[in-house]
Amino acid sequence: MAASTMSICSSACTNSWQVDDCPESCCELPCGTPSCCAPAPCLTLVCTPVSCVSSPCCQAACEPSACQSGCTSSCTPSCCQQSSCQPACCTSSPCQQACCVPVCCKPVCCVPVCCGASSCCQQSSCQPACCASSSCQQSCRVPVCCKAVCCVPTCSESSSSCCQQSSCQPACCTSSPCQQSCCVSVCCKPVCCKSICCVPVCSGASSPCCQQSSCQPACCTSSCCRPSSSVSLLCRPVCSRPASCSFSSGQKSSC
């Protein structure tokens, strides 16, 4: 045993009587050598490096070795210890910034997110990126891209087919409780635009929107008639004198 040990540690252990007391320097080879942080060339109980954690060669290697157990906390990321996959794409945020293969990261933190028209949208169980900006999408998108609970498509244009299929208040209704101008009735569904306030209002007395409205049109609010919140088809005046009321043809005064 002494002879074999002497041949390995001959540079540091010059005399046979020094074998059992081999200096620690024979184990602390320069960083970069194959035996760096390797099993001690002399007797293990004597020559195992005691400063493995602080050794620069341990921290740089991070490879399985005899001394890794002594410096795991320093040279092995915490994500590496429990994960069998590549942890790099998980460190930036709770969810990935771009579509990533699910096996790459642990599901607990790295559910794939939606990046544009990628197929990642269809398979994602996490709230995709196209839903993060607001409670409803800003423009019409394919429903499969986002969960229905938060991302019902909204109406971007009055002629958009998205209006007809939307169960959310479309864009043409969001500006105010009542529309600012005549709008095609199909654009705002009754389920989201209550007839008492959100039916089309007219921009002028001659507008056909007035005649088709199911609620008090705006052409009645300029006179002494009741405001547009009234559900009556008539322009009921609120003035004390009938002479001061302006009526459309076919309408009756209740003054």
Curated annotation (Swiss-Prot):
Q: Which domain of life is it from?
A: Eukaryota
Tissue-specificity statement: Restricted to a narrow region of the hair fiber cuticle, lying approximately 20 cell layers above the apex of the dermal papilla of the hair root; not detected in any other tissues.
Q: Where are the sequence repeats?
A: 26-30, 36-40, 57-61, 79-83, 89-93, 99-103, 104-108, 109-113, 114-118, 120-124, 130-134, 145-149, 150-154, 162-166, 172-176, 182-186, 187-191, 192-196, 197-201, 209-213, 219-223, 224-228
Q: Where is this region: 22 X 5 AA repeats of C-C-X(3)?
A: 26-228
A single GO CC term for this protein reads:
keratin filament
Keyword list (alphabetical) reads:
Keratin, Repeat
Q: Does the keyword Repeat apply?
A: yes
Q: Does the keyword Signal apply?
A: no
Coiled-coil region: none
Membership in a protein family: Belongs to the KRTAP type 10 family.
State whether it acts alone or in a complex, and with which partners, per the record.
Answer: Interacts with hair keratins.
- Protein task: In the hair cortex, hair keratin intermediate filaments are embedded in an interfilamentous matrix, consisting of hair keratin-associated proteins (KRTAP), which are essential for the formation of a rigid and resistant hair shaft through their extensive disulfide bond cross-linking with abundant cysteine residues of hair keratins. The matrix proteins include the high-sulfur and high-glycine-tyrosine keratins.
Name of the protein this chain belongs to: Keratin-associated protein 10-2
Question: What is the organism field in this record?
Answer: Homo sapiens
In the UniProt record, the gene name given for this protein reads KRTAP10-2
